[in-house]
């Protein structure tokens, strides 16, 4: 027990130090204001319900039920990382991904992951779930030089995010996980495979029917 407490304390210090460092560079409120004041920032109510549901289903289906960190998913991911002796991105909530996007670079390290968690707690303390969702889709990268859902929606489909169909929504929701692989202009076959994963998740969590899914895929 003593060693476990020491280990937890060390992890806490590492995470807190990592987050404190980036906060000194630019405070949270300044970072958020910089993002939300952009001309093409898309509000939650200006997104297609299909798109919102697709993102939640594939990225973080318990988003509205857990806090900043989904400890169930994180524990599962950490176990896998230790077992496979490699660091993976698994277990991140949407809030943690926002924290990563606005505070940290894409470096894979334990200190960044822990700092990301501190950022996530700070975000959930100051912003609503819908506001955090907005931040996620407005800072995500969709490939082809498109940052944010406005650029992706117009770039790929020439329409506003509120007008995205289920087909388009399920395609775009799958891209940020690996834009260099899943962007529809990179490899349409892999993009369609990823889209099918999104639709399967939407079906599993009750967002669409089997017919909705087959209408898109056939």
Question: Can you say where each PLM-predicted feature lies in the sequence?
Answer:
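Juxtamembrane regions of bacterial inner-membrane/periplasmic proteins
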Residues: 1, 5-218
């Amino acid at each position: 027990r003593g060693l476990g407490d020491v280990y937890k304390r060390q992890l806490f210090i590492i995470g807190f130090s990592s987050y404190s460092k980036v906060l000194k560079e630019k405070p949270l409120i300044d970072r958020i204001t910089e993002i939300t004041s952009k001309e093409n920032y898309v509000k939650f109510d200006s997104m297609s319900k299909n798109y919102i549901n697709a993102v939640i289903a594939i990225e973080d289906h318990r988003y509205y039920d857990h806090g900043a960190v989904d400890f169930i998913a994180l524990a599962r991911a950490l176990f896998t990382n230790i077992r496979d002796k490699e660091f993976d991105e698994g277990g991140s909530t949407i809030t943690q991904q926002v924290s990563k996007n606005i505070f940290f670079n894409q470096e894979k390290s334990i200190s960044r992951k822990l700092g990301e968690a501190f950022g996530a707690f700070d975000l959930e303390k100051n912003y609503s779930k819908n506001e955090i969702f907005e931040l996620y889709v407005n800072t995500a990268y969709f490939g082809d030089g498109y940052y944010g859902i406005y650029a992706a929606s117009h770039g790929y489909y020439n329409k506003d995010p509120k007008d995205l169909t289920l087909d388009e929504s399920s395609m775009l929701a799958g891209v940020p996980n690996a834009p260099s692989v899943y962007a529809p202009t990179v490899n349409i076959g892999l993009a369609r495979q990823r889209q099918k994963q999104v639709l399967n998740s939407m079906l599993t969590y009750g967002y669409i029917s089997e017919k909705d899914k087959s209408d898109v895929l056939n």
